[in-house]
Amino acid sequence: MVVPFPGSPRPTLGVEWEIALVDRVTRDLSNTAAEVFDAVANLAGPEDPRITKELLRNTVELVTGIHSTVGEAMDDLDESLDLLRRAANPLGVDLICAGTHPFAQWSTQLVTRTPDYDELIERTQWWGRQMLIWGVHVHVGVSSPQKVFPILNALLQRYPHLLALSASSPMWAGVNTGYASNRALMFQQLPTAGLPYQFANWGQYEDFISDQMKTGVITKIGGMHWDIRPAPRWGTIEVRVFDGISTRAELSSLVALVHCLIVDLDRRFEAGENLPNLQPWHVKENKWRAARYGLDAEIILDEDSNERLVTDDLNDLLEKLAPTAVRLGCADELAAVAEIPRRGASYQRQRQVAEATGGDLVAVVDALVKELGT
């Protein structure tokens, strides 16, 4: 089948930021999304397209419009977050963003009733109900379908950098899992999620989508929820690697990193360069290492199986991308990526709070609420 990809003449930028609702007193998740949406409508009018529903009724997603720069996208998110806060505050609801909630139980969460979500839960059953997770998705415009998989495949080489920097889900249902990102390994249990296939060209992807629809695996083109995927409707590559990002500063820096990575790979493709394409088994291992060890992961760099500490490789990567960041107007945001290892990633900060308070996970949520305000 033909999968249209209209393309974007410019490397446009869009961001989706999933926000969890927590009770101000108990710090448990709050299944009050319906009430929050009513409050948003009272403040700003019905159906604000930037504030949307998600699978669970403890979650609200902030969605930007189409932008040219990181600064524009962040201004958009700032407006939506401010509106969401004003709606949630009178309800006794605070906001956090992390890959998982430290102690909430999946069995007490309510599902948003829509045909798509009903179908998901009916098909995936226990695993689908376990999806008590939050992430950030970044879209970058690409001009033609012929570029999509060379860029996507090369981007997988940087998968562990993106996951390690954003990792924010060390705890699950009150347990310290030992993983920096438990979310990454939870989400891949769904049949349409996980790492993408490394297709050689757009035609192979079209054949794959045809097979999936013919056999009932998906019912629409957007039904594959890979960690990095084409978004044909928008003419973008969508990066879905990130755990929920806990602070505005980290969000802006990591959005800049994705924008620069894709634009740099696009430039190199246009120049006739053969982009890197790491073996699938190395990509899979790198995902696991980043999920397990976070910023302490030793990652596989290339087809020759050379290895390096992810933070050491990150320093070189930021230097290489600096000229691209200048052209895109996000030099300061990209440079701020280096602050994450210095300060400690969210998973490290959460563990530190838990250790300092004798394992008080309510205190961890308190810290996450405070961080989202910075």
UniProtKB/Swiss-Prot annotation:
It is an enzyme of class 6 (ligase). It catalyses: L-cysteine + L-glutamate + ATP = gamma-L-glutamyl-L-cysteine + ADP + phosphate + H(+). InterPro entries: GCL_type2/YbdK_subfam, GCS2, Gln_synth/guanido_kin_cat_dom, YbdK. GO terms for biological process: modified amino acid biosynthetic process. Its EC number is 6.3.2.2. Keywords: ATP-binding, Ligase, Nucleotide-binding. One of its GO terms (molecular function) is ATP binding. SUPFAM superfamilies: Glutamine synthetase/guanido kinase. Belongs to the glutamate--cysteine ligase type 2 family. YbdK subfamily. ATP-dependent carboxylate-amine ligase which exhibits weak glutamate--cysteine ligase activity. NCBIfam families: gshA_cyan_rel (TIGR02050), PRK13517.1-2 (NF010042), PRK13517.1-3 (NF010043), PRK13517.1-4 (NF010044). HAMAP family: Glu_cys_ligase_2. This is Putative glutamate--cysteine ligase 2-2. It comes from Rhodococcus jostii (strain RHA1).
